[in-house]
């Protein structure tokens, strides 16, 4: 009998934790990560020709 109550509580907790959540927080975090990735990508694009030129001078 106690097992049934415990099983029911575990199932309810799993449904609450794994159910649909508000995407607002996750969406904001994803946008911040995407923005940081774009900044890094743009910085690499700007810096790569400079680094290639320095390497060519060293040879």
UniProtKB/Swiss-Prot annotation:
Lineage, highest ranks first: Eukaryota, Metazoa, Ecdysozoa, Arthropoda, Hexapoda
Modification type Leucine amide: residues: 57
Subcellular compartments: Secreted
Swiss-Prot/TrEMBL GO biological process terms: antibacterial humoral response; defense response to Gram-negative bacterium; defense response to Gram-positive bacterium; innate immune response
Protein name: Cecropin-B1
Disulfide topology: none
Signal peptide coordinates: 1-23
Pfam families according to UniProt: Cecropin
Task of the protein: Cecropins have lytic and antibacterial activity against several Gram-positive and Gram-negative bacteria.
Protein species of origin: Culex pipiens pipiens (Northern house mosquito)
Keywords, in A-Z order: Amidation, Antibiotic, Antimicrobial, Immunity, Innate immunity, Secreted, Signal
InterPro entries xrefs: Cecropin, Cecropin_insect
GO cellular component: a single term: extracellular space
Protein family per UniProt: Belongs to the cecropin family.
């Amino acid at each position: 009998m106690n097992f049934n109550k415990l099983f029911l509580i575990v199932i309810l907790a799993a449904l609450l934790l794994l159910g649909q959540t508000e995407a607002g927080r996750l969406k904001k975090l994803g946008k911040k990560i995407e923005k940081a990735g774009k900044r890094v990508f743009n910085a690499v694009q700007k810096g790569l020709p400079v680094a290639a030129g320095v390497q060519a001078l060293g040879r």
